[in-house]
Amino acid sequence: MGISYPFRFQREPEPARARLTIASPDTLPAETLRAVRMGNGDRIVVIGAGEAFTALADQTRDLMIDPARGNWDFFADHSSDYARSSAVAAFIPIDPRDRDASWLYAGRYVLARAIEHVGQQPGAMLSGVRDLVRNLPPDALAEFAGHDTICSQGVRWAETVLAGVRTPLHQIANHDPRMPKTSIVRWLAGPASTILFIHRDPDRADHELQAIVASLRDHAMLGRIDVEMALGAAQLVIEGTTR
C-alpha cells in the first residue's frame, strides 16, 4: 500500500543564470561578443596583449586591469576573510604532491597577515603588501614563530618562508596615477555589456593574474554567475608551470 502525503513539495525551476566567459582574443567566440555587446546579460573578461587585444576594446565604456601599472583595486575586491584567503592561495599555490609544504603554509599565513594589516590603511593597494613583506626582518618572523633568534636554523627557516612570499610579490607594480583604479566588484555592478580587459605581459609571471581570476570566480559565485574558462592554449603560467 502506498504512503499518502498530506502535501507535496514542488521545486520551482531555477531561473536562467548569467554566464561569465574568460577568454583570450583568439578564443573569444564572435557570437558571444556580439550577444554581450547587445546586452544579453552575460559578461566577458578578455586576457591578453597586442593589437588583437586592444582591437576588441571599446574605449568609451570598457575597463582594464593592467598589473604592470598597478591599477587593480585589490582591497575593494577582498573585503571578507574568504576573499582574502582565496587571494593568498592564488599567490602561493601548493602542489598536493609536495612532500613538505610546511614553509608554504607558513608563507600563506605571513601573506594573509600582511594583507589584513595593509588593508586597514585608506587607499591601500597591493604595492603596500609587497613593501611590508619586503621589509619584514627574518629574525622578527623567526621570533614570532617561536624560534630562538640566536639559533641560525630558525632564522634560515624564516628566510625560506619570506622568500616564498616575496617571489610572487616582487613584480607587483606601484599604481600609475594616470591609470584609473579598476575593481571587479564595481565592474560587476555596472552594465553587463561593459567588458573587462586584463593586460597580460608575457615577460611577467602570472601570480597577480591568478589572483585576479580567483577573485573573478569568487564574485561570480556570489552573484550566481556561471564561469566558462575559454583561454585555450593561453593558460596562466606560474614559474614555468601551467595552471
Task: Briefly describe each language-model feature range.
Residues 1, 5-7:
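Short hydrophobic short-linear motifs embedded
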Residues 2, 13-15, 21-23, 28-242:
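P-loop NTPase motor domains
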Residues 9-11:
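Short N-terminal leader segment in a subset of presequences, especially plant chloroplast
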